[in-house]
Protein backbone atom coordinates (compact mmCIF):
# COMPACT_ATOMS: atom_id res chain seq x y z
CA UNK A 1 0.00 0.00 0.00
CA UNK A 2 2.83 2.43 0.63
CA UNK A 3 3.72 3.01 -3.09
CA UNK A 4 0.07 3.76 -3.87
CA UNK A 5 -0.26 6.35 -1.15
CA UNK A 6 3.02 7.92 -2.18
CA UNK A 7 1.93 8.28 -5.81
CA UNK A 8 -1.39 9.86 -4.90
CA UNK A 9 0.38 12.31 -2.63
CA UNK A 10 2.80 13.16 -5.43
CA UNK A 11 -0.01 13.76 -7.92
CA UNK A 12 -1.98 15.78 -5.39
CA UNK A 13 0.88 18.04 -4.35
CA UNK A 14 2.06 18.54 -7.91
CA UNK A 15 -1.30 19.57 -9.32
CA UNK A 16 -2.84 21.29 -6.35
CA UNK A 17 0.07 23.20 -4.90
CA UNK A 18 2.22 23.82 -7.99
CA UNK A 19 -0.11 23.88 -10.95
CA UNK A 20 -1.59 27.26 -10.90
CA UNK A 21 -1.40 30.53 -9.47
CA UNK A 22 -2.46 34.33 -9.99
CA UNK A 23 -5.29 36.42 -8.66
CA UNK A 24 -7.21 39.64 -7.97
CA UNK A 25 -6.26 43.16 -6.98
CA UNK A 26 -8.33 46.35 -6.99
CA UNK A 27 -7.16 48.08 -10.14
CA UNK A 28 -8.10 50.85 -12.54
CA UNK A 29 -11.07 50.92 -14.88
CA UNK A 30 -8.73 49.85 -17.72
CA UNK A 31 -9.70 46.30 -16.81
CA UNK A 32 -13.41 46.89 -17.29
CA UNK A 33 -13.12 46.49 -21.06
CA UNK A 34 -11.11 43.27 -20.85
CA UNK A 35 -13.08 40.08 -21.32
CA UNK A 36 -11.50 36.64 -21.21
CA UNK A 37 -13.17 34.42 -23.83
CA UNK A 38 -14.01 30.76 -23.41
CA UNK A 39 -11.44 28.28 -24.67
CA UNK A 40 -10.64 24.56 -24.80
CA UNK A 41 -7.13 23.18 -25.03
CA UNK A 42 -5.07 20.03 -24.65
CA UNK A 43 -2.35 20.34 -22.00
CA UNK A 44 0.44 18.04 -20.87
CA UNK A 45 1.58 17.98 -17.24
CA UNK A 46 5.00 16.51 -16.38
CA UNK A 47 7.42 16.24 -13.50
CA UNK A 48 10.12 13.73 -12.56
CA UNK A 49 7.54 11.14 -11.47
CA UNK A 50 4.28 11.71 -13.35
CA UNK A 51 3.21 12.57 -16.90
CA UNK A 52 -0.40 13.10 -17.92
CA UNK A 53 -2.39 14.59 -20.77
CA UNK A 54 -5.70 16.34 -20.27
CA UNK A 55 -8.27 18.85 -21.47
CA UNK A 56 -8.62 22.24 -19.87
CA UNK A 57 -11.49 24.56 -20.74
CA UNK A 58 -13.24 27.74 -19.70
CA UNK A 59 -17.02 27.67 -20.08
CA UNK A 60 -19.59 30.47 -19.74
CA UNK A 61 -22.97 29.07 -18.70
CA UNK A 62 -25.31 32.06 -19.01
CA UNK A 63 -25.65 35.83 -19.35
CA UNK A 64 -25.53 36.21 -15.55
CA UNK A 65 -21.79 35.53 -15.63
CA UNK A 66 -21.70 32.01 -14.19
CA UNK A 67 -18.53 30.34 -15.46
CA UNK A 68 -16.47 27.18 -14.95
CA UNK A 69 -12.81 26.45 -15.57
CA UNK A 70 -11.88 22.78 -15.40
CA UNK A 71 -9.08 20.31 -16.04
CA UNK A 72 -9.65 16.60 -16.76
CA UNK A 73 -6.69 14.26 -17.24
CA UNK A 74 -5.83 10.57 -17.26
CA UNK A 75 -2.67 8.82 -16.17
CA UNK A 76 -1.76 5.12 -15.78
CA UNK A 77 -4.45 3.42 -13.67
CA UNK A 78 -6.09 6.68 -12.68
CA UNK A 79 -7.57 10.06 -13.48
CA UNK A 80 -7.91 13.55 -12.04
CA UNK A 81 -10.67 16.12 -12.29
CA UNK A 82 -10.36 19.72 -11.06
CA UNK A 83 -13.32 22.11 -11.35
CA UNK A 84 -13.66 25.77 -10.38
CA UNK A 85 -17.13 27.34 -10.38
CA UNK A 86 -17.26 31.12 -10.14
CA UNK A 87 -19.19 34.15 -11.30
CA UNK A 88 -17.97 37.22 -13.13
CA UNK A 89 -20.03 40.40 -12.83
CA UNK A 90 -18.87 43.92 -13.71
CA UNK A 91 -15.42 42.44 -14.29
CA UNK A 92 -15.18 41.08 -10.74
CA UNK A 93 -14.51 37.37 -10.23
CA UNK A 94 -16.31 35.80 -7.28
CA UNK A 95 -15.36 32.26 -6.26
CA UNK A 96 -18.14 29.75 -5.58
CA UNK A 97 -16.73 26.21 -5.37
CA UNK A 98 -13.44 24.43 -6.05
CA UNK A 99 -13.57 20.66 -6.45
CA UNK A 100 -10.84 18.03 -6.89
CA UNK A 101 -11.40 14.32 -7.54
CA UNK A 102 -8.35 12.03 -7.85
CA UNK A 103 -8.66 8.30 -8.44
CA UNK A 104 -5.77 5.84 -8.69
CA UNK A 105 -6.43 2.08 -8.65
CA UNK A 106 -8.55 1.56 -5.51
CA UNK A 107 -7.72 4.90 -3.90
CA UNK A 108 -10.09 7.87 -4.16
CA UNK A 109 -9.32 11.37 -2.92
CA UNK A 110 -11.99 14.08 -3.11
CA UNK A 111 -11.66 17.64 -1.82
CA UNK A 112 -13.95 20.66 -2.03
CA UNK A 113 -13.66 24.32 -1.11
CA UNK A 114 -16.93 26.21 -0.56
CA UNK A 115 -16.85 30.00 -0.80
CA UNK A 116 -19.94 31.24 1.06
CA UNK A 117 -19.92 34.90 0.11
CA UNK A 118 -23.15 35.64 2.01
CA UNK A 119 -21.75 34.50 5.37
CA UNK A 120 -18.15 35.44 4.57
CA UNK A 121 -16.90 31.90 5.19
CA UNK A 122 -14.53 29.59 3.33
CA UNK A 123 -14.93 25.89 4.18
CA UNK A 124 -12.89 22.84 3.18
CA UNK A 125 -14.31 19.31 3.01
CA UNK A 126 -12.36 16.12 2.32
CA UNK A 127 -8.88 15.20 3.56
CA UNK A 128 -8.32 18.65 5.06
CA UNK A 129 -11.31 19.90 7.02
CA UNK A 130 -11.37 23.50 8.18
CA UNK A 131 -13.42 26.69 8.15
CA UNK A 132 -11.93 30.14 7.65
CA UNK A 133 -13.41 33.64 7.55
CA UNK A 134 -13.02 35.37 4.21
CA UNK A 135 -11.15 38.66 4.37
CA UNK A 136 -13.43 41.68 4.23
CA UNK A 137 -13.04 43.78 1.07
CA UNK A 138 -10.58 41.26 -0.40
CA UNK A 139 -11.29 38.89 -3.26
CA UNK A 140 -10.05 35.36 -2.53
CA UNK A 141 -9.44 33.07 -5.49
CA UNK A 142 -8.93 29.35 -5.95
CA UNK A 143 -5.99 27.68 -7.75
CA UNK A 144 -7.82 27.64 -11.11
CA UNK A 145 -9.80 30.85 -11.42
CA UNK A 146 -6.78 32.87 -10.32
CA UNK A 147 -5.36 32.41 -13.77
CA UNK A 148 -8.26 34.39 -15.24
CA UNK A 149 -7.23 37.31 -13.04
CA UNK A 150 -3.56 37.18 -13.91
CA UNK A 151 -4.51 37.51 -17.56
CA UNK A 152 -6.73 40.50 -16.79
CA UNK A 153 -3.98 42.17 -14.78
CA UNK A 154 -1.36 41.74 -17.50
CA UNK A 155 -3.79 42.98 -20.17
CA UNK A 156 -4.34 46.07 -18.00
CA UNK A 157 -0.60 46.74 -18.00
CA UNK A 158 0.19 45.86 -14.40
CA UNK A 159 3.84 44.97 -13.86
CA UNK A 160 3.49 43.86 -10.23
CA UNK A 161 0.49 42.77 -8.19
CA UNK A 162 -0.48 40.80 -5.09
CA UNK A 163 -3.45 38.42 -4.97
CA UNK A 164 -5.05 36.31 -2.25
CA UNK A 165 -5.13 32.49 -2.14
CA UNK A 166 -6.02 30.04 0.63
CA UNK A 167 -3.53 27.48 1.87
CA UNK A 168 -5.28 24.25 0.95
CA UNK A 169 -4.06 22.41 4.04
CA UNK A 170 -4.67 25.00 6.75
CA UNK A 171 -7.10 27.52 5.26
CA UNK A 172 -4.79 30.46 5.95
CA UNK A 173 -5.43 33.14 3.32
CA UNK A 174 -2.09 34.39 2.04
CA UNK A 175 -0.92 37.12 -0.33
CA UNK A 176 0.84 35.83 -3.44
CA UNK A 177 3.11 38.32 -5.19
CA UNK A 178 3.60 38.43 -8.96
CA UNK A 179 5.87 40.38 -11.28
CA UNK A 180 6.32 40.66 -15.05
CA UNK A 181 9.98 39.73 -15.53
CA UNK A 182 10.67 39.08 -19.21
CA UNK A 183 9.47 38.24 -22.71
CA UNK A 184 9.85 34.82 -24.27
CA UNK A 185 8.56 32.40 -26.90
CA UNK A 186 6.80 29.05 -26.85
CA UNK A 187 5.62 26.81 -29.69
CA UNK A 188 2.10 25.38 -29.72
CA UNK A 189 0.98 22.97 -32.45
CA UNK A 190 3.62 24.22 -34.89
CA UNK A 191 3.11 27.95 -34.24
CA UNK A 192 5.63 30.03 -32.29
CA UNK A 193 4.02 32.54 -29.92
CA UNK A 194 5.61 35.54 -28.26
CA UNK A 195 4.97 35.49 -24.52
CA UNK A 196 4.96 37.76 -21.49
CA UNK A 197 6.51 35.94 -18.52
CA UNK A 198 5.08 36.51 -15.05
CA UNK A 199 6.92 35.16 -12.01
CA UNK A 200 5.57 34.22 -8.60
CA UNK A 201 7.99 33.65 -5.73
CA UNK A 202 6.83 32.05 -2.48
CA UNK A 203 9.68 32.36 -0.01
CA UNK A 204 7.79 30.32 2.59
CA UNK A 205 7.79 27.35 0.18
CA UNK A 206 11.16 28.00 -1.50
CA UNK A 207 9.23 27.87 -4.77
CA UNK A 208 9.36 29.88 -8.00
CA UNK A 209 6.63 29.68 -10.64
CA UNK A 210 6.67 31.26 -14.10
CA UNK A 211 3.61 31.77 -16.30
CA UNK A 212 3.90 32.31 -20.07
CA UNK A 213 1.05 34.44 -21.47
CA UNK A 214 0.51 34.69 -25.24
CA UNK A 215 -0.91 38.09 -26.34
CA UNK A 216 -1.94 36.62 -29.71
CA UNK A 217 -4.20 34.15 -27.87
CA UNK A 218 -5.98 36.69 -25.63
CA UNK A 219 -3.11 36.35 -23.13
CA UNK A 220 -3.86 32.68 -22.59
CA UNK A 221 -1.41 30.93 -20.24
CA UNK A 222 0.24 28.43 -22.57
CA UNK A 223 3.06 27.27 -20.30
CA UNK A 224 3.76 27.05 -16.57
CA UNK A 225 7.19 26.28 -15.08
CA UNK A 226 7.48 25.48 -11.38
CA UNK A 227 10.70 24.93 -9.45
CA UNK A 228 11.11 23.92 -5.83
CA UNK A 229 13.23 21.63 -3.68
CA UNK A 230 11.46 18.57 -5.12
CA UNK A 231 12.41 19.38 -8.71
CA UNK A 232 10.84 20.88 -11.83
CA UNK A 233 7.20 20.71 -12.86
CA UNK A 234 5.81 21.71 -16.27
CA UNK A 235 2.39 22.39 -17.77
CA UNK A 236 2.30 23.00 -21.53
CA UNK A 237 -0.44 23.70 -24.05
CA UNK A 238 -0.21 21.32 -27.00
CA UNK A 239 -3.32 22.19 -29.01
CA UNK A 240 -6.32 24.54 -28.99
CA UNK A 241 -9.74 23.35 -30.12
List where the protein language model places each region.
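Sec-dependent signal peptide recognition
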Residues: 16-22
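Hydrophobic, well-structured mid-protein blocks that either form specific transmembrane helices
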Residues: 108-153
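N-terminal signal peptide c-region/cleavage motif recognized by signal peptidases
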Residues: 28-29
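Acidic, serine/threonine-rich low-complexity disordered tracts
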Residues: 34-117, 157-241
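Acidic, Ala/Val/Gly-enriched low-complexity intrinsically disordered segments
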Residues: 5-8
